[in-house]
């Protein structure tokens, strides 16, 4: 570990002073790690360094500006996007679970930070502001709580939140059940060749959405008979040109902003100093120091550490105030800050317009994913992921011109197809249901929504399908056998994580899915389970070996909703994140969620179908050929006999 020069040169007496620091940090004898008295902190190699320096009367925590490089590992959470842990330092992650007020009495202590000049200022300000907001939130809560209140004894409203006369929307079943390969495999049905071919085409389009600038209309027409229409990038370019023309127009009246107001806002941003954020780091260190069960000898990738790493990023957004959330919602709905890009193509033969939405690939998509508190969908009682719903509202407005144009051109013959990978699939589903619920497009004109590796975002989605006159076949959810993203919101949430969510945000206190089923959002629609070849990813213990695409058929005898829930918890996302092999460009998280691997796996299933058809054709040809040859010999003999009779006559 890189130490500050002042610390490296301290005398033994000074070292003893360091050990007596009230923040609980001491320097290890080896000089390689920074550990805690009675417990210890092990620094993740991707986090900022925290150093303690003793002065005359100053207690300081320094963040060393060296950024350790880790070529083969990146910070990967339960989502498909990648978040650098430099945005949320490791010690602070622990604070996001529990608070410690012991450091509040030492607000006057001087805290310094050496900033990294190569970091983007906006990114640094982002996590600092979030942390300060959490700190203010907790201070307000602590004032209302008794001084010696315990987390386990905190009064939390755990009512379902559903109207009793209407029934609960969270009837999903428990995770309990004795499921294994034999019992679970009986519920699986292999998809047909025609359906696999359709899914292969849509998976290809979803993968293409990540490289929209490289799309060639000729390739789409030649390979799939599709015509490229437009994309979000073209819309943004046109909007930029129009805005530039308006600015150059002498008759255009510009929006006047007050310089004084702007400077005041800037000074307020500066006031949110990084020093205050590192006070939180000191509190975090003190909290970990007080945890006697924390064992430094245990691997850092244990499930508990993985749980903290996964939930800390979510907590930062959950704790934000309503004003900040409304501002984030407005950003998600704007064209320029939309979380996902998209493109549109037509199938002239079937009058179908296909909308393909990209998955998580930007900071805005990170916001949409983590802004995951429940809210009502379209003035109904059905709850939906708020961040993705807000983003879908913006994409809905962007799609409207293309939808109305297609309807006006083809009338009743017009059809619409929505698809997407990861976050894009969830957005596709919400936009699709918004169009139907608002009466702009009839349900008959909508083809089934197809998602690939997308998180479930509805609590009680079956209810909204029933209200719109749809059945579960309207939604086709394709998930890789070990993909962590579809499991992210639908796995079993540990009690301590659920408690933190309820403490920080009141909407989770009456969230039916969380209170009744210990999950955030329940699965909906038909679930397709895609297993690649063993050379790509290990076989799931509940699936037959080999590359295959199955439908989890609920009409099979012995089916229960607990089967799907049990599958979504095996492996549990925290179990996946607890493994070293989960991280990095070659890690299992990226491997089992990559859109390219979805395309390869579905195409592998198609090749198996093709080989099987060819093999059957060969067998049939070989079995029919002797019959044809024998029939030919009999025909020749009959012709010869007829000739003899005729010559005799």
Swiss-Prot record:
It is a peripheral membrane protein. Disruption phenotype: Reduced levels of oil seeds and delay in seed germination. Keywords: Chloroplast, Hydrolase, Lipid degradation, Lipid metabolism, Membrane, Plastid, Thylakoid, Transit peptide. Residues 1-67 form a transit peptide. Its EC number is 3.1.1.32, 3.1.1.26. It comes from the Eukaryota. GO terms for biological process: fatty acid transport; lipid catabolic process; triglyceride biosynthetic process. One of its GO terms (molecular function) is galactolipase activity. One of its GO terms (cellular component) is chloroplast thylakoid membrane. It catalyses: a 1,2-diacyl-sn-glycero-3-phosphocholine + H2O = a 2-acyl-sn-glycero-3-phosphocholine + a fatty acid + H(+); a 1,2-diacyl-3-O-(beta-D-galactosyl)-sn-glycerol + 2 H2O = 3-beta-D-galactosyl-sn-glycerol + 2 a fatty acid + 2 H(+). Plants overexpressing PLIP1 exhibit stunted growth and accumulate anthocyanin under normal growth conditions. Belongs to the AB hydrolase superfamily. Lipase family. This is Phospholipase A1 PLIP1, chloroplastic. The lineage of its organism: Eukaryota, Viridiplantae, Streptophyta, Embryophyta, Tracheophyta. The gene is PLIP1.
